[in-house]
């Protein structure tokens, strides 16, 4: 028995659909732009749709006003999306239905293990609560892994092998604090939106096998995956909101777009200063070459706003 059709959209549309799904934990930075631009160019080069989803399911990590700022930043850099923005904060009903279905099928269970206990056994959950039949009080919900996914094909990097212990772990899909886990929400929403290919940063390679295992449990078609290289700051650390990466400049977006295109290994117009943002992006779509994107997970190339 598959999840109800009215809630989970079947991927019958063979047209390309890509997406960019930022969390509102801060403004977009250069690393965010690489992911947004790469997914945008891949979608447009395939004559496909490019969607934007705001992943606002973790209120403690959210910065007030960041979501709207992110949307304005995308517009400032010429990255206009198709259709309406999907907000995960408005999708709780879908996640609850997904949790209920998994529970009814015996594919999940309640777990009361603390983080301290799991760390004491090496950091990988050992299935301690799998057959203890706990109730929901003060408990997280874990997936009951039956056919772990230990590898997947990345269209840029080839076959990627996962850590076997991590791949076999019964991971959390609903947190003890009542929040929905990222892996559950992203799979439910990517399927609901009909996303056919996921283009994102290489920092999300690790959870991919878990997400694929969820697709398989639900009986859904698995999308293709492309993981783009990550940018470093001048100190050699990954650009991220946690590392206080500077927000994208609010001035002329063209030099930053050109820097992002260079980072992605793409051909750039020699006299780009004579081009508008729209013209730069049109040229980038026309010349987009996935095989030119560096395959390494982290590119030893630094960026700072001062360089623009």
Curated annotation (Swiss-Prot):
Q: Which cofactor does it need?
A: Zn(2+)
Q: Which domain of life is it from?
A: Bacteria
Concerning its family, UniProt says:
Belongs to the class-I aminoacyl-tRNA synthetase family. GluQ subfamily.
Q: Which SUPFAM superfamilies match?
A: Nucleotidylyl transferase
Q: Which UniProt keywords apply?
A: Aminoacyl-tRNA synthetase, ATP-binding, Ligase, Metal-binding, Nucleotide-binding, Zinc
Q: According to the UniProt entry, what is the EC number of this protein?
A: 6.1.1.-
Q: Name one GO cellular component term.
A: cytosol
**Protein residues bound to Zn(2+):** 111, 113, 125, 129
How are cofactors bound according to the entry's free-text note? Binds 1 zinc ion per subunit.
**InterPro entries from the entry?**
Glu-Q_tRNA(Asp)_Synthase, Glu/Gln-tRNA-synth, Glu/Gln-tRNA-synth_Ib_cat-dom, GluQ/Sye, Rossmann-like_a/b/a_fold
The record's function comment reads: Catalyzes the tRNA-independent activation of glutamate in presence of ATP and the subsequent transfer of glutamate onto a tRNA(Asp). Glutamate is transferred on the 2-amino-5-(4,5-dihydroxy-2-cyclopenten-1-yl) moiety of the queuosine in the wobble position of the QUC anticodon.
In this chain, L-glutamate is annotated as bound at 19-23, 55, 182, 200
- Give the classification, highest ranks: Bacteria, Pseudomonadati, Pseudomonadota, Gammaproteobacteria, Enterobacterales
Q: Which residues are recorded as binding ATP?
A: 241
Positions occupied by motif 'KMSKS' region: 238-242
Q: State the species of origin.
A: Escherichia coli O6:H1 (strain CFT073 / ATCC 700928 / UPEC)
How is this protein named in the record? Glutamyl-Q tRNA(Asp) synthetase
Q: What is any one GO biological process for this UniProt entry?
A: glutamyl-tRNA aminoacylation
What would be an example GO MF term here? zinc ion binding
Residue interval(s) of motif 'HIGH' region: 22-32
The record's Gene3D superfamilies line, in alphabetical order, gives: HUPs (3.40.50.620)
């Amino acid at each position: 028995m598959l999840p109800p059709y009215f809630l989970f959209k079947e991927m019958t549309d063979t047209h390309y659909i890509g997406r960019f799904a930022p969390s509102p934990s801060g403004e977009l930075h250069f690393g965010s732009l690489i992911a947004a631009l790469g997914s945008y160019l891949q979608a447009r080069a395939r004559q496909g749709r490019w969607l934007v989803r705001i992943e606002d399911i973790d209120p403690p990590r959210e910065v007030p006003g960041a979501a709207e700022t992110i949307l304005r930043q995308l517009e400032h850099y010429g990255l206009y999306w198709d259709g309406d923005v999907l907000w995960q904060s408005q999708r709780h009903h879908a996640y609850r239905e997904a949790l209920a279905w998994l529970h009814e099928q015996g594919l999940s269970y309640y777990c009361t293990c603390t983080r301290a206990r799991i760390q004491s056994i090496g950091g990988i959950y050992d299935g301690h609560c799998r057959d203890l039949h706990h109730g929901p009080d003060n408990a997280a919900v874990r997936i009951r892994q039956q056919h772990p996914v230990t590898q997947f094909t990345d269209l840029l990097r080839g076959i990627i092998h996962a850590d076997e212990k991590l791949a076999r772990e019964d991971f959390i899909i609903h947190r003890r604090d009542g929040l929905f886990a990222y892996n559950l929400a992203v799979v439910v929403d990517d399927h609901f939106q009909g996303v056919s290919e996921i283009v994102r940063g290489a920092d999300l390679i690790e959870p991919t096998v878990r997400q694929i295992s969820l697709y398989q449990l639900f009986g859904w078609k698995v999308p293709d995956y492309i993981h783009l290289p990550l940018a470093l700051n001048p100190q050699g650390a990954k650009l991220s909101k946690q590392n206080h990466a500077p927000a994208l400049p609010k001035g002329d977006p063209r030099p930053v777009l050109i820097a992002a295109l260079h980072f992605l290994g793409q051909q750039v117009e020699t006299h780009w200063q004579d081009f508008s943002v729209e013209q730069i992006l049109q040229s980038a779509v026309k010349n987009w070459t996935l095989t030119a994107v560096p395959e390494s997970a982290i590119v030893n190339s630094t960026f700072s706003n001062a360089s623009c």
